[in-house]
């Protein structure tokens, strides 16, 4: 059981760890001009990641999600996964990726200990996918998903950002896609960040619109588990797959928060849209600093706010989602 509990009684057993800020896509809602390196980046190394994960595991965390940027750009990703997977107490190692390198690299990740896969796939239509992401790579991603099924990965999820006027008419196609595929598709409300205000105003779509369509089509909301994340899950008796709705602008979205974040440069972020980061990297250089690292993490939890400030237009330190991995 997690020892990480904040002043609002929320318990944290899930860490989202960014491995890089770099990305090979140019998604219109995130990095439309592509990744621009700020000097020579120095992201967390394998040894530092090992010390970090051991600390969180000692505090009761059991799930680690590797994010980016695009984590598959790390050449040492197999080693990172193996390092994380062998930490005592870690039961689930997941990755969120754009999926372009799955056909080539997924078998190695699986052997290293990967147990769950999330793939960003904002459209089922090839031309639309190219328009949104800046790359015509949907066939490779579909190939990678088939490989994930063949390897027997127990959890496969797809993430699609809801974009008004770009992909908001695809729900019937997604329903058909899930009829024979045991995937969970997550529709995510577009979130305002530091550099996308105009884009947000043009393309934000409330998730309620999708929920109404799901209910009208005979889908039913499933009971939420006590340790579930923010998604509202919907199922249908005639479909193998499920649909999740992640609506950060909905009431009580932050009430069940169960995750913390660490950036690719080693800063603890208590909230995706928090106003500050807590540097952990100085305590990741020696095994002897383990106890000091535990103390820094637990002390900072007392500063976690009840909720984000998105409704007030507050986006915190997040210039775009590639900087912290969502």
Task: Annotate each PLM feature.
Residues 1-14, 176-180, 190-326:
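Auxiliary Fe-S-binding modules of radical SAM enzymes
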Residues 7-47, 272:
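Canonical Radical SAM [4Fe-4S] cluster-binding loop centered on the CxxxCxxC motif
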Residues 19, 66, 185, 266:
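Residue-level signature of catalytic and energy-coupling elements of molecular machines
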Residues 25, 126-127, 252, 278:
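Glycine-centered loop/turn positions within well-structured domains
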Residues 26, 30, 74, 127, ...:
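Residues that scaffold the ATP/ADP-binding catalytic core of kinase and kinase-like folds
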Residues 35-39, 103, 125-132, 194-198, ...:
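A short acidic, helix-capping loop that chelates divalent metal ions and anchors anionic groups
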Residues 43-65, 73-188:
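Radical SAM/AdoMet-radical enzyme domain recognition
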Residues 70:
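Conserved G/P- and acidic residue-centered "switch" motifs that form tight phosphate/ATP-binding loops
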